[in-house]
């Protein structure tokens, strides 16, 4: 049964694709990931938005986005699959292997680990309703046995943020949302979102060591945080509500320190997961 494959101290790490665009950064990040995985079972989810944008520009495809979320038509999806599942994922897997840690490249389509439903029309921060197209929302019922088996066998799964619906339609999935849902599904103890900012910043661009729900609502209302950070915080809050106790957004530009580093602890509302309720 699946419970035999769960691990109480799994780390799910979401890696911003902008951190691995150059060969030198890729080598450094791969080394950091290998070290982290030696200390704690680790599952990596990566994006690659900048490389998707560049490839779309080369192909003459216009980018459409709202509140940090990419609107995805057929041509945009084909580019995303090619860049994320092909170029970025393969390159990162090879680099982590070269750093001494056995890694396995996956997408959300593999064993349906990234099972998703087509996203409903989205209400923007400005109050408009837009259709996101071939964009998926990860679901809680996605099977996680493959990931648990790989982790227990000593491998580090590295997952491109491409999802799949029950009828086999590939979809673009926000990497933060996928990482958050995987953290919940795996009963991970930690979700770490690694990017190019020093966590959540205040109006003076200083890193906030900790934020709660009220802090986030105030920052959004005052227009202090960007649309991209709003999307990250939404995913982090979902992970907390799903029972992930430790959620952080950290700066990965110089190193990825899973035990510290510059960043923000997400201290939003949480619920007691079902496996813990049974103990009460």
Question: What are the residue ranges of the model-derived segments?
Answer:
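C-terminal catalytic "cap/lid" subdomain
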Residues: 2-280
């Amino acid at each position: 049964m699946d419970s035999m494959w769960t691990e109480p101290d799994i780390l799910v790490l979401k890696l911003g694709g902008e951190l691995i665009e150059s060969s030198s950064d890729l080598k450094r990040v791969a080394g950091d990931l290998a070290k982290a995985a030696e200390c704690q079972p680790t599952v990596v989810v990566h994006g690659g938005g900048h490389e998707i944008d560049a490839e779309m520009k080369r192909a003459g495809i216009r980018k459409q986005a709202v509140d940090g979320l990419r609107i995805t038509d057929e041509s945009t999806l084909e580019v995303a699959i090619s860049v994320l599942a092909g170029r970025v994922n393969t390159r990162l897997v090879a680099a982590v292997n070269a750093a001494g840690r056995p890694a396995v490249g996956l997408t959300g389509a593999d064993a349906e680990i990234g099972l998703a439903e087509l996203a409903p029309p989205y209400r923007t921060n400005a109050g408009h309703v837009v259709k996101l197209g071939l964009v998926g929302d990860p679901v809680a019922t996605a099977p996680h046995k493959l990931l648990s088996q790989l982790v227990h066998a000593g491998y580090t799964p590295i997952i491109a943020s491409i999802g799949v619906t029950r009828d086999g339609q590939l979809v673009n999935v926000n990497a933060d949302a996928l990482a958050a849902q995987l953290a919940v599904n795996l009963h991970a103890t930690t979700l770490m979102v690694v990017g190019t900012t020093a966590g959540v910043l205040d109006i003076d661009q200083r890193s906030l060591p900790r934020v709660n729900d009220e802090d986030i609502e105030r920052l959004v209302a005052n227009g202090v945080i960007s649309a991209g950070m709003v999307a990250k915080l939404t995913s982090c809050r979902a992970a907390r509500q799903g029972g992930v106790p430790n959620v952080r957004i950290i700066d990965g530009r110089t190193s990825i320190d899973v035990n510290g580093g510059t960043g923000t602890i997400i201290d939003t509302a949480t619920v007691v997961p079902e496996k813990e309720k049974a103990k009460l």
